[in-house]
Amino acid sequence: MLSSFNEWFWQDRFWLPPNVTWTELEDRDGRVYPHPQDLLAALPLALVLLAMRLAFERFIGLPLSRWLGVRDQTRRQVKPNATLEKHFLTEGHRPKEPQLSLLAAQCGLTLQQTQRWFRRRRNQDRPQLTKKFCEASWRFLFYLSSFVGGLSVLYHESWLWAPVMCWDRYPNQTLKPSLYWWYLLELGFYLSLLIRLPFDVKRKDFKEQVIHHFVAVILMTFSYSANLLRIGSLVLLLHDSSDYLLEACKMVNYMQYQQVCDALFLIFSFVFFYTRLVLFPTQILYTTYYESISNRGPFFGYYFFNGLLMLLQLLHVFWSCLILRMLYSFMKKGQMEKDIRSDVEESDSSEEAAAAQEPLQLKNGAAGGPRPAPTDGPRSRVAGRLTNRHTTAT
């Protein structure tokens, strides 16, 4: 059963152009070609990268965040309340006012006290700035290293400057060790991101991030197996060119260097728009869609590969819209607003001031008159103006 599926899955017509077989890509006479089994090393490499990340965040990222002045906010802990906790975990984190009134009556609390409990309970689950800084600093280190390493690998290759050369003698293109190790490192890193996704800081575009990481892993796996390494390497380099800038923006933002953060974000926005909305469609998509089949007809891998690239481009457009909204706010107000993907800390003063304008529910169920808004409520600094990848690809 398994052998039959394996034989069907690796049919030449799925992976290779017409009239090309796997036999032509066997190593011979010192010529080495990519083989799908080479990628089995990516999983243990991902585990090694995870261990390196944990060590980096613990022994480098955390001390660095404190040295640079990144401080966690002091959060007021909620008083244990079984009824409210059960509703929070099973029914939702943001109950409507009728639900709040009912819960307040059940617990013998005022409406304002119940609102405050849910607000502080939500804040309790939000990640602290030092955790965000550690994650951003690890990704910054990897993306910058990967971009510099990839540029050094591809700088002297003809297809970096003329993407049409990706199809020169395709698929009979030999594998260079430097390109193999760079590709394997990228695949291992994205696998480690997928493994860590449930435990990392979650953004409002969490689903888009999951899709992006899965598409990236499938693209790298397919492109390596089908010897589409040349065009695949251009896709990787194009994404790495802006990702490290985004992570740098986050780090500076957590350090509260507003002017530096604004300047970096403008640079990142320009690089992101140019690489994802200009170079990617005009150089990558054009050559894979038109020039790749100039000498050979289309095949399943052609449609599959281009379909994944188009899905990646849709994610680029989605994140570009988020960036444009932030840029519009920047142009309007003169400083960068919080990242609209971020989960923002809620302050006690904001909702208490609003609640003071409406009657409050008392313990006995009677409505009380409006109370003056508190003037000494703690004001939490808005955290997380900028986030991760991608706003990426990735």
UniProtKB/Swiss-Prot annotation:
<keyword id="KW-0472">Membrane</keyword>
<dbReference type="InterPro" id="IPR016439">
    <property type="entry name" value="Lag1/Lac1-like"/>
</dbReference>
<dbReference type="GO" id="GO:0030148">
    <property type="term" value="P:sphingolipid biosynthetic process"/>
</dbReference>
<dbReference type="GO" id="GO:0046513">
    <property type="term" value="P:ceramide biosynthetic process"/>
</dbReference>
<feature type="region of interest" description="Homeobox-like">
    <location>
        <begin position="67"/>
        <end position="128"/>
    </location>
</feature>
<feature type="transmembrane region" description="Helical">
    <location>
        <begin position="140"/>
        <end position="160"/>
    </location>
</feature>
<comment type="function">
    <text>Ceramide synthase that catalyzes formation of ceramide from sphinganine and acyl-CoA substrates, with high selectivity toward long and very-long chains (C18:0-C22:0) as acyl donor.</text>
</comment>
<feature type="modified residue" description="Phosphoserine">
    <location>
        <position position="342"/>
    </location>
</feature>
<feature type="glycosylation site" description="N-linked (GlcNAc...) asparagine">
    <location>
        <position position="19"/>
    </location>
</feature>
<keyword id="KW-0597">Phosphoprotein</keyword>
<feature type="domain" description="TLC">
    <location>
        <begin position="131"/>
        <end position="332"/>
    </location>
</feature>
<keyword id="KW-0256">Endoplasmic reticulum</keyword>
<dbReference type="GO" id="GO:0003677">
    <property type="term" value="F:DNA binding"/>
</dbReference>
<comment type="pathway">
    <text>Lipid metabolism; sphingolipid metabolism.</text>
</comment>
<dbReference type="Pfam" id="PF03798">
    <property type="entry name" value="TRAM_LAG1_CLN8"/>
</dbReference>
<dbReference type="Pfam" id="PF00046">
    <property type="entry name" value="Homeodomain"/>
</dbReference>
<dbReference type="InterPro" id="IPR006634">
    <property type="entry name" value="TLC-dom"/>
</dbReference>
<feature type="region of interest" description="Disordered">
    <location>
        <begin position="341"/>
        <end position="394"/>
    </location>
</feature>
<keyword id="KW-0443">Lipid metabolism</keyword>
<feature type="transmembrane region" description="Helical">
    <location>
        <begin position="179"/>
        <end position="199"/>
    </location>
</feature>
<feature type="topological domain" description="Lumenal">
    <location>
        <begin position="1"/>
        <end position="31"/>
    </location>
</feature>
<dbReference type="InterPro" id="IPR009057">
    <property type="entry name" value="Homeodomain-like_sf"/>
</dbReference>
<feature type="modified residue" description="Phosphoserine">
    <location>
        <position position="349"/>
    </location>
</feature>
<feature type="transmembrane region" description="Helical">
    <location>
        <begin position="209"/>
        <end position="229"/>
    </location>
</feature>
<dbReference type="InterPro" id="IPR001356">
    <property type="entry name" value="HD"/>
</dbReference>
<dbReference type="GO" id="GO:0005789">
    <property type="term" value="C:endoplasmic reticulum membrane"/>
</dbReference>
<keyword id="KW-0325">Glycoprotein</keyword>
<keyword id="KW-0812">Transmembrane</keyword>
<feature type="transmembrane region" description="Helical">
    <location>
        <begin position="260"/>
        <end position="280"/>
    </location>
</feature>
<feature type="transmembrane region" description="Helical">
    <location>
        <begin position="32"/>
        <end position="52"/>
    </location>
</feature>
<feature type="short sequence motif" description="Last loop motif">
    <location>
        <begin position="291"/>
        <end position="301"/>
    </location>
</feature>
<keyword id="KW-0444">Lipid biosynthesis</keyword>
<feature type="transmembrane region" description="Helical">
    <location>
        <begin position="304"/>
        <end position="324"/>
    </location>
</feature>
<keyword id="KW-0808">Transferase</keyword>
<protein>
    <recommendedName>
        <fullName>Ceramide synthase 4</fullName>
        <ecNumber>2.3.1.-</ecNumber>
        <ecNumber>2.3.1.24</ecNumber>
    </recommendedName>
</protein>
<dbReference type="GO" id="GO:0050291">
    <property type="term" value="F:sphingosine N-acyltransferase activity"/>
</dbReference>
<feature type="topological domain" description="Cytoplasmic">
    <location>
        <begin position="325"/>
        <end position="394"/>
    </location>
</feature>
<keyword id="KW-1133">Transmembrane helix</keyword>
<feature type="modified residue" description="Phosphoserine">
    <location>
        <position position="350"/>
    </location>
</feature>
